[in-house]
Amino acid sequence: MMVEMDYAKKMQKCHEYVEALEEEQKKIQVFQRELPLCLELVTQAIEACRKELSGTTTTTSEQCSEQTTSVCGGPVFEEFIPIKKISSLCEEVQEEEEEDGEHESSPELVNNKKSDWLRSVQLWNHSPDLNPKEERVAKKAKVVEVKPKSGAFQPFQKRVLETDLQPAVKVASSMPATTTSSTTETCGGKSDLIKAGDEERRIEQQQSQSHTHRKQRRCWSPELHRRFLNALQQLGGSHVATPKQIRDHMKVDGLTNDEVKSHLQKYRLHTRRPAATSVAAQSTGNQQQPQFVVVGGIWVPSSQDFPPPSDVANKGGVYAPVAVAQSPKRSLERSCNSPAASSSTNTNTSTPVS
């Protein structure tokens, strides 16, 4: 009875263990892409437990008899039923570890393992019946055939063009693989440099063509300027006319509004300069002190200070005549010829001399 109780407890524990594993399997199925190996291990454990339960139910009588004999004093040979699948997997793992221990010095196998873990997705779906060597060859083939279809991280791979591969194929027939890889890299680098130089030359040619295709600057000939002035006179002056109106009046082929506008601005600046110079000259002339000339003891302003008659009439100024000192000879002659002097002489002559 005690043996049957122990057996029932073991069966109950196995059922509970299977249920717990099934719950974990449901949780891991959500992250099937991220945790494929964990999901595979859990499913294998569930299958092993179920096989153990099915095997134990069919052989309950045999186990009970063996256990009763063991209780009676006989030796116990087996307590658990061995599982072929798990044992075979353990043996394969041990063999792989031994082979890896023999070939630890080769760095290529280490790199292959890393690439297997990073790139391969179907490594854990292998069949247990294959030999370790065949399994390793199948893994390598799968790594080569896998194509990046998902959005996961992929290592950077330089794109090699067909034109760059042609010289590399020719060199491969006469040189080993190590030298061919170096030559392909150098050829690819040279071709990239040549392409970059060609692009720069093409850009420079386009820029030079754009400079040549630019419109030349307008040269304003005397005839063109005369038309410009006629248009200004008809339109009412440079401050009233607009560039568009001037261009319409001039009727010149190829003349643009911008060219007329720039010429109009230059003309306005040119017409403003004489007015500014005349105002500056007047201001400097007013600041100069008047000059005087001494004539016969009288201060007389110089002729430069007198404006012309037209200016006098325009300004409306009044000027008085200036008496100029005469020479002494002419003054004596005039005094002799005057009637007062003659009468005085006559009286002097008529009076008797005492």
From Swiss-Prot:
Induction: Induced under phosphate deprivation conditions. Residues 243-268 bind DNA. It holds the Pfam family Myb_DNA-binding. Keywords: DNA-binding, Nucleus, Transcription, Transcription regulation. GO terms for cellular component: nucleus. It is found in: Nucleus. One of its GO terms (molecular function) is transcription cis-regulatory region binding. GO terms for biological process: cellular response to hypoxia; phosphate ion homeostasis; regulation of DNA-templated transcription; response to abscisic acid. Residues 93-112, 324-354 are annotated as: Disordered. Residues 337-354 have a biased composition (Low complexity). Disruption phenotype: Reduced number and length of lateral roots. Residues 212-272 form the HTH myb-type domain. Signal peptide: none annotated. NCBIfam families: myb_SHAQKYF. Probable transcription factor involved in phosphate homeostasis. Involved in the regulation of the developmental response of lateral roots, acquisition and/or mobilization of phosphate and expression of a subset of genes involved in phosphate sensing and signaling pathway. Is a target of the transcription factor PHR1. This is Transcription factor HHO2. It comes from Arabidopsis thaliana (Mouse-ear cress). The gene is HHO2.
